Amino acid sequence: MKYSIKAPAKINLSLDVIRKREDGYHEVEMIMTMVDLADRVDLSLRADGGISIDVSEGFVPSDERNFAYQAASLLKKRYNVREGVHIYITKRIPVAAGLAGGSSDAAATLKGLNELWQLGLSVDELATLGAEIGSDVSFCVYGGTALATGRGELIKPIASPPPLWVILAKPPIGLSTADVYNGLKLSEARHAKTAEMIAALERQDAASICALLHNTLEDVTLRLYPEVAHIKEQMKRFGANGVLMSGSGPTVFGIVEKESRVNRIYNGLRGFCDEVYAVRLIRTSGTCPNTDENGML
């Protein structure tokens, strides 16, 4: 028996770092939403009880370092599952991009194995398990649009944004999340207007959403990687209504209100950036529009 499920990418409409905690993590306040760029996770039962994983991209770990593998291992051990699983991930989300590709793959694996292994776990239970794997996994289990607090694992659903286009562009650079956080000086950091962003989402006010986009980590990344600043400048020049770096980067996204501008921005960025995507915001939780439905095969 097999199960196939989509794993959508996320972007941060707002990311604020509040303080560094005693456990080494940072206290954050983030507004995250999903876009219809998605990996595909195919799960196949193994009678021998083993866990194996293959990934379409060769530079993605295909062992216990992979979040999807960790998700399967956690479920199997926690609930004493005898059956094993083979996981095959078809990657479409750029790797190490600030788009939570690995976290979304883990969330999809948790949800898919809950069905395949007939565990009967609630979404809340799956999200709690996800927090043991990574900070973004809980959000990816819920999907939709949410306010994430704590280290990112405390999730509160909020209003989804209006149906806008999003252009994603990832420069060809390697980025260390640890370096970005280490370079952050909280005493000098600019902070997000989180409550105002939530209110703008509730009003479906696209202009205010674009104006309130904020990422406290962005100034650090722009200082370390000028290529990211260049992409931001070009997106604005080509006509994006709002531009921001997602997560710790390096991917930059532009929100576009008018469909007529999408091709101009996309084609303009393709001139100097190989990984460019034109996508839509997902307004419902769980699955991706315009993709195969999740389910048993």
Curated annotation (Swiss-Prot):
Associated pathway: Isoprenoid biosynthesis; isopentenyl diphosphate biosynthesis via DXP pathway; isopentenyl diphosphate from 1-deoxy-D-xylulose 5-phosphate: step 3/6
GO molecular function: 4-(cytidine 5'-diphospho)-2-C-methyl-D-erythritol kinase activity; ATP binding
Positions that bind ATP: 94-104
GO BP annotations, alphabetical order: isopentenyl diphosphate biosynthetic process, methylerythritol 4-phosphate pathway; terpenoid biosynthetic process
Enzyme Commission numbers on file: 2.7.1.148
Enzymatic class: transferase
Keywords in alphabetical order: ATP-binding, Isoprene biosynthesis, Kinase, Nucleotide-binding, Transferase
Chemical reaction(s) catalysed: 4-CDP-2-C-methyl-D-erythritol + ATP = 4-CDP-2-C-methyl-D-erythritol 2-phosphate + ADP + H(+)
Location of the active site: 10, 136
PANTHER family to which the protein is assigned, alphabetical: 4-DIPHOSPHOCYTIDYL-2-C-METHYL-D-ERYTHRITOL KINASE, CHLOROPLASTIC (PTHR43527:SF2)
Role noted for this protein: Catalyzes the phosphorylation of the position 2 hydroxy group of 4-diphosphocytidyl-2C-methyl-D-erythritol.
Family (UniProt): Belongs to the GHMP kinase family. IspE subfamily.
Designated name of the protein: 4-diphosphocytidyl-2-C-methyl-D-erythritol kinase
Organismal lineage: Bacteria, Bacillati, Bacillota, Bacilli, Bacillales
